[in-house]
């Protein structure tokens, strides 16, 4: 199992590079974490205290997943030797689908680039 600092880097830091597989699997995990409270919300009676609790948990999960998706995309763009600011394109409807496919399908730069020596590790200062 990865160390806690590795998971913190993967989901919350923007330095370094990630591979296509790490980007896709990290994004899938974020989506599952985000979907769970939404699923639980649909199972409880509308307007109940439990409903309010699950909607609040979903809101927190959504905010955390938003940042996690940005951090993953920035590191994936770094692997393609592109600036992280380009990740903002993921907020444009329709274009975001194409951008997601590009990030999942295009191979990263082999060897070192200006964002890190190797894929799937933080950049060294």
Which role fits each region the language model picked out?
Residues 1-29, 69-85, 102-125:
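Membrane-interface extramembranous regions at the lipid-water interface
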Residues 31-66, 71, 84-90, 96, ...:
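Membrane-helix interface segments in multi-pass membrane proteins
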């Amino acid at each position: 199992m990865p160390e806690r600092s590795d998971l913190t880097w993967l989901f919350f830091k923007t330095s370094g590079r990630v591979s296509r597989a790490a980007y896709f699997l990290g994004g899938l995990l974020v989506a599952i974490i985000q979907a769970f409270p939404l699923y639980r919300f649909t199972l409880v009676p509308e307007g109940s205290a439990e409903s309010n609790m699950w909607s609040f948990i979903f809101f927190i999960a959504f905010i955390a997943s938003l940042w996690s998706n940005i951090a993953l995309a920035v590191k994936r763009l770094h692997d393609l030797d592109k600036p992280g600011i380009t990740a903002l394109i993921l907020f444009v409807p329709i274009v975001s689908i194409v951008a997601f496919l590009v990030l999942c399908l295009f191979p990263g730069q082999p060897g070192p680039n200006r964002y890190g020596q190797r894929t799937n590790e933080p950049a060294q200062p």
